[in-house]
Amino acid sequence: MENKPILSFEKVSIIYKKAPLLQNISFKVMAKENVCLLGKSGVGKSSLLNSVTNTKIVKSGLVYFDGVASNKKEYKKLKKQCSYLDQIPNLIDTDYVYEAILRSAKQKLTWLQKLICFEPKWIKDKILAILKEVNLNDYVSCIIKDLSAGQKQRVEIAKLFFKSPKLLLVDEPTTGLDPLTASKIMDLITDFVKREKITLVFVTHDIDLALKYSTRIIALKNHALVLDRLTEKLTKEQLYKIYDN
């Protein structure tokens, strides 16, 4: 079966605070690709990623998800098959780790099960298995606010395991993390998308992470797309040029 694009940008322009941020951006992401959006901080990488689920920031052009344009009514429903992992974990500080993941797990329950607060055994078993996979099995009863930044990001990744999206958008997931923890976080993400056959688009300014974890790199500079190439055909020296003034 022919591999079709799951995500497309067609002449997309984004304005931030009344000033042009990105202009005339066009590219396609094929199913099961690991695509990295690379560039300096403030170049518009995160805004472009955010435009997939928040189309209000798109001033001109169209975003397509699974072949449906962002100006169609079906797009709003379809984009629910897309998950977004932010650089700042979206967690409740007073939750226990188990509770935080249970909130995502409850999306799989019927309205009646939610109403009577029914928690099937399979959900509990899966949560415990997931916590073991992300190396948080010793933190089940820990409060979120007591976790390190890396551990909080692991909780966010664990929440994704219940969603099984078609497309995973990841915005600077290693911000503020040491290199070893950053690699472990990226290992978890890429192992997950490979196992579940999910398409990944992630944002970073880290050239080493881009080269290690992507199959394709798209670089942004001076409001434009300046590079789109398979990762295996790129060198670190070529990517450093993107950061030149």
Curated annotation (Swiss-Prot):
Residues engaged in binding ATP: 39-46
Record has Aminoacyl-tRNA synthetase as a keyword: no
Entry keywords, A to Z: ATP-binding, Nucleotide-binding, Transport
Homology family: Belongs to the ABC transporter superfamily.
Name of the protein in question: Probable ABC transporter ATP-binding protein p29
Pfam families to which the protein is assigned, alphabetical: ABC_tran
GO function terms (MF aspect): ATP binding; ATP hydrolysis activity; ATPase-coupled transmembrane transporter activity
Protein source organism: Mycoplasma genitalium (strain ATCC 33530 / DSM 19775 / NCTC 10195 / G37)
The keyword ATP-binding appears for this protein: yes
Function comment: Part of a high-affinity transport system.
Residue ranges occupied by any ABC transporter domain in the UniProt entry: 7-245
Any single Gene Ontology cellular-component annotation: ATP-binding cassette (ABC) transporter complex
